[in-house]
Amino acid sequence: MSLLRRIVRNSTVSKAVPVAKAFMPYPLGRDPSSLPKLDPVSISYIDSRPISLRYRVRAMIEMSNLDEASKLSRLAVLNGFLVDRDTVFICNSVIGAMCSAKRYDDAISLFNYFFNESQTLPNTLSCDLIIKAHCDQGHVDDALELYRHILLDGRVAPGIETYMILAKALVDAKRFDEACVLARSMSCCSFMVYDILIRGFLDIGNFVKASQIFEELKGLDSKLPGREYHKANAIFNVSFMNYWFKQGKDEEAMEILANLEDAQVLNPIVGNRVLQVLVKHGKKTEAWELFGEMIEICDSETVDIMSEYFSEKTVPFERLRKTCYRKMIVSLCEHGKVSDAEKLFAEMFTDVDGGDLLVGPDLLIFRAMINGYVSVGRVDDAIKTLNKMRISNLRKLAIHQAP
C-alpha cells in the first residue's frame, strides 16, 4: 500500500491527536500580512439583549451586510461566546458568504483568524470553502497544499466534496494524471469524483480513456459501494449521452436515455443530470416530460435547470415542494411571469409565525419580486413589497428574544 493511500486511510480513522502535538498553521496560499486587516473586536461591541450570536450573524448575512457579519463572527472564538454547536457554524457561515460574494481575500483572512490565530478546530466544510476559493481563482496548487496539510495534520478528514472540488479543478487545468491519482487515493470510492474524470476525458475527445474508467467501475471487481452501484452507472451513462449529443449523434444519445430505468431517472441526482443534458441540447419536449415526472421530488437545482423554459408553459405549482419556492420565484420574475411568482410569494408569508423571523421570504426573494413588479409596470405593488421588506428587516434587528 502506498504512503499516500495509508495517509488517506488513517486520516479517516480518528480525529484525536496527542495533546503534545505542535500546532501546524493551515497554509493560506499567500503571506498572511498581505491579507485584509481585521480590526480587534471585543465583547462590548454588541448590546446586552439575550440574542444568540449565531442569530445575529445569520441576520447580517441575510441582509447582505457582510462587513458587520464579519465583525460579529469574530466574537465566536472568544471565551465568552465559545459554544460547541455554534462556533464553527458561525465561522463557516461568514466565510461561505464572503466566498459567494467573491471576496476571497476576506474569506481567507477570516479563515486565518479563526483557525490559525485563534486555533479553533475547523471541520471539513471550513477547509472545503477555502480549497474551492483557491480553485475558483485558478490557484490549484494552493488548494492542493491545504489538502495535503489536512491529510498530514489528521484532525480533519477530507470528504467527498473535497475530492470533487479538487478533481474538477485538476481536470479544468488539464492535469489529468494528477486527477486520476487523486481519485485512486480515496479511501472510499466516489462515483461523483470518477464522473468528473469521465466527463473531462470526453470533453477532450478521449473516448477510449473515458470508456476504460467506466468499464473498470461497472465490472465484477468494481470499487463502487453496492448501495451506489446502479445510481453511479446511470450517472456515467448520462455523461456519455451528453457526449453523443455533442457529436451530433442524437440517436445514440436517445438510446442511452431510453435504457435508463424509471427508478434511476426519478432519483434527483440522476434526474437533474438528465434534465441538464436535455436542456443543453434543446430537447424541450423530453425535458418537460421528465420535469413533469420529477416535480414532486425536484429540488432547487431542478428548478434552476428548467428556468429558461418557464416562460413557455404553465408549471403545476400545486405539486411543487415548498423548498423550491425560493428558486422558482426568482426564476418566474426573471421570465416575466410575475403573477405566478406572486402566488408563491404570498404562500410563503402564510407559513411565517409571528416570532419565527428567519422563515419566509429572504432579501433575494424580496428583490426579485420588486424587480418583477417594476418590469411589468406594477410600481405600486413594488413599493408595497419594498415596505414589507423593510419591516421584515427591522423585525430581525429589533427582536428581544433569541430563537
Curated annotation (Swiss-Prot):
Keywords: Mitochondrion, Repeat, Transit peptide. GO terms for cellular component: mitochondrion. PPR repeats lie at residues 87-121, 123-157, 159-189, 190-224, 233-263, 267-297, 321-351, 362-396. It is found in: Mitochondrion. Residues 1-18 form a transit peptide. Its main location: mitochondrion. PANTHER family: PENTACOTRIPEPTIDE-REPEAT REGION OF PRORP DOMAIN-CONTAINING PROTEIN, PLASTID TRANSCRIPTIONALLY ACTIVE CHROMOSOME 2-LIKE PROTEIN. Belongs to the PPR family. P subfamily. This is Pentatricopeptide repeat-containing protein At3g60960, mitochondrial. The lineage of its organism: Eukaryota, Viridiplantae, Streptophyta, Embryophyta, Tracheophyta.
